[in-house]
Amino acid sequence: MEGTTKTKKWDWGQDVLCQIRNANMDESVIFAHQQRVLEALASKDNRTFPIFDTCRLENGGILRLPQLDQKIISQENDDIGIVAFVPAAGASSRYLAPLIPLLDAARMRDAEACAVAVMKMEMDGVMSCPLPSSIKLLLTALKSGITKVSDDLFEQVVREIDAPKALYPAVLEGDSFLCLKRLEHKNLGGLLGEIYICPPGRSADFNREASTVASSLESMFIEQDSSLATLRFESSGQVALDDHGQISSVPAGHGALLPLLPRVRELFPKARAVFIRNIDNISGNSSLVVEATRSFKDNFCRTLSLMDRLREAASQHDMVQLKSIGQSILDIWGITTDAADDPLESLFSRLFHTNVTKMPEDLQRLLARPLVLMGQVPNSANDVGGTCVFADVDGWRQKLCIEVPHVSETDRQVFLENAAKATHFNPVFVMAEIPGQTMINAWNSHPFWLVAKKSWNGRQVYYQESILYEMLGCGHYANVLFVEVPRAVFNPHKSLKDAGQKHLRHWIKS
């Protein structure tokens, strides 16, 4: 098969190598991506992780949030700074699919084509959804006569439809997804600040939009530039070049954001952890959502505080304290043990479900991994994907938040499409301890990637994407707990009609 021969770095040619360096890309990372593309092209089967069983409440793979004493956790919450971390660089192409004919017509300054596109939108019920103000202005202009559409209005329509999804209206009043997320963070309280990952060159636009929401919470913006991207490759494995001989970069998946986590500490020096949610998942601030989120945060802080004490005891080789603290963590999460059980072994094998070969020799390695709390919402019986499972990852039985591309067809039918087995799924509701550079480096060789096949410039190209929630949600790389949270925290907006005709008050209670 074409692409089975490994390509060497120097096969790129000096010009391509210079372009990669000038784009601030790490050539060793791009080379690794290239080898993965070649591996995928050479393989007859997609890379999958065989599933032993799903994680469920009944088998301890998923846990319920414990009730904590507020007096105990108040100080810990103050000591453990958490920053909201929101990936928001994604385009809105899928969300705005019904508006593409209007966008194309506005780009051509074709008022008649705009009128046809708007008529179709009205027939499809799109005009009742949250839309940019320019579309309503355009509709007024069209009703007044097609000759009255100005170039400025055409430009405004193009600019607003072509905006990143974060800046798009989420409610009828026009408040954007970014504004709603900021309001949610404001109402939640207890956060050090918030960071939004935005497209290249759009940080000023994001900052301007965030400033429309009055809040003492500091907002920071990190642009997802070429250093977080990968390259497109031909089926031969060679770097794909455009008609001008230039390389073509493309986002390398949310997993590429992982190296950004240490930067959170640079922006917020007191930060210990991040709270990750998607920009287009609106939770609102109902009492159910706020209480569940605070409980989630409190349990994370309590557990991380005890893990810190565990690390301190390990540094002093204090086995008495180690066993006592380990038992305290088990008690919080309701893990019962026998008197003969070693609390440390039980902590990692029965709570974190990770591989323990020998104690206490394994302890430093296990404690070096970040603590991750990954929320899981009940499955409506129609949700497939983002399922937490016990799987074979490179020969080890591991707890894993698995994505559909890494599931065989048989396992998909037996586990993911079986509502009795796939009882919960990942809504992207995650609190993760900020990892050190050693752990970031360890993730460089992770197996949680896939190769996307896309049409580009009239030909098929391939590129690697890393899957963040498999990386954070694997028991080999993190001390991860899957925890049930209410379905109310999960309201994704994947199409315009998901927004419906909702007003701001539907989500944010004053």
Summary of predicted features, one role per range:
Residues 46-380, 390-400, 406, 493-495, ...:
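Domain-scale recognition of functional cores that engage charged ligands
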Residues 319, 327-510:
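OB-fold and OB-like single-stranded nucleic-acid-recognition modules
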Residues 3-21, 27-28, 74:
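Non-transmembrane, aqueous-exposed alpha-helical and coiled segments at domain scale
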Residues 25, 29-54:
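Extended, charge-enriched "interface" segments that sit outside catalytic cores
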Residues 2-3, 270:
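Residue-level detector of intrinsically disordered, flexible termini
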